[in-house]
């Protein structure tokens, strides 16, 4: 039984099946299936090498881990902050592995091809942050998917949390608005206010 100490007060045993924290033991639930959802800060899918060289793969600015209990049907969403510092697999400009380096978690996606390699690198980094928890599947979307997903559910109702009239006159602070089409992307991309 190999034991490794990851951070102060935390020990992991049995390849992540058992985590000991502050003297309490937490056993991994085998009925949980986990899916990492990533929102990537690119306008289009990086399908050609020229685009990738010019613009890069992008960063996974939004990371959510869905934990699905296949026995009970319960789904829990865990927001994984993009700015967590993690040891990320890095690659040089030729794609050659150059070791794990301490980087913001969102950069794990950037060390890839904007497709499966990027996603798998992000999955690896998130798993490491969460003490080796297995991540069974992943899905990434880019910015162009926001309006499509929004419209697929008939729009999203929001109370505007900051004055965004400079980008859309209907987005007045405090207004209740149903975001439709590209308006949803405009809203989530706006950085003119800090909701915290």
Residue spans for each PLM region:
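Non-catalytic, solvent-exposed segments at the cell envelope interface
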Residues: 1-196
């Amino acid at each position: 039984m190999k034991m490794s100490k990851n951070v102060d007060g935390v020990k992991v045993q049995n390849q992540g099946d058992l985590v000991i924290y502050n003297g309490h033991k937490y056993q991994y639930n085998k009925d949980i299936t986990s899916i990492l959802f990533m929102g990537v800060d690119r306008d289009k899918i990086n399908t050609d090498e020229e685009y990738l060289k010019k613009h890069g793969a992008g960063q996974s600015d939004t990371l959510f881990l869905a934990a699905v209990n296949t026995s009970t049907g319960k789904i829990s969403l865990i927001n994984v902050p993009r700015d967590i510092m993690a040891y990320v697999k890095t690659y040089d400009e030729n794609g050659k592995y150059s070791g794990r380096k301490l980087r913001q978690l969102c950069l794990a996606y950037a060390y890839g091809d904007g497709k499966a390699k990027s996603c798998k690198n992000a999955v690896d980094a998130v798993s490491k942050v969460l003490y080796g928890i297995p991540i069974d599947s992943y899905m990434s979307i880019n910015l162009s998917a926001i309006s499509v997903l929004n419209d697929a559910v008939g729009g999203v109702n929001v109370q505007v949390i900051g004055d965004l009239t400079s980008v859309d006159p209907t987005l007045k602070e405090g207004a209740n608005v149903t975001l439709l089409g590209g308006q949803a992307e405009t809203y989530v991309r706006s950085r003119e206010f800090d909701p915290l």
